[in-house]
Amino acid sequence: KQGQRGWKLYSWHAPETECIAKGKAAKPYEFGVKVSLTTTNRRCKGGQFILHTKSLPGLPYDGHTLAEVLEETQALTGREIERAYVDKGYVGHKAPKPLRVFRSGQKRGVHGQIKKELRRRSAIEAVIGHCKSDGHLDRNYLKGRQGDQINAVMSAVGYNFRLILKWLKALLCKIIAAMWAQM
């Protein structure tokens, strides 16, 4: 990264490492590459599936990445996205016009159902936490920019597989309980 005194090197073994300023008191900086995760906003019985993930090298501004990420999510799911709920970093986004984007903490144009759905936006924070801790998104052992992209995708795939396995385990328990009840 170009600093005041030249290029900064944050890691000898991974020169593509970047410093991401989080602005939090406990952990003000994170080192690595930005990753974008997209989930549904609906409450799901088994948990929220990750629909799209992408590593964003070069520290792009969040608002500039929104249009591309939503377009790729629409292509993957085959469904038109009507509303997007994002965090406060997406001020000045460049999303296409028919799509409505609501930021957390926004007051204008927020009422009724949208207010409920906007409160639901914070549910993705748990998904991000599980991907970082269980899915090894916090530490990447793969090399280069391509390794960053593969790590982000594999973390999301692993998270989705864990949800499916949890659902299959519950289904198997119900089947076994029904078989025991008949005996």
Regions found by a protein language model. Name each.
Residues 18, 43, 107, 160-163:
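Short loop/turn segments at secondary-structure transitions that flank enzyme active sites
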Residues 138-139, 163-183:
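A short, flexible helix-boundary coil/loop motif
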Residues 40, 69-76, 127-130, 134, ...:
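Generic, well-ordered alpha-helical scaffold segments in large soluble proteins
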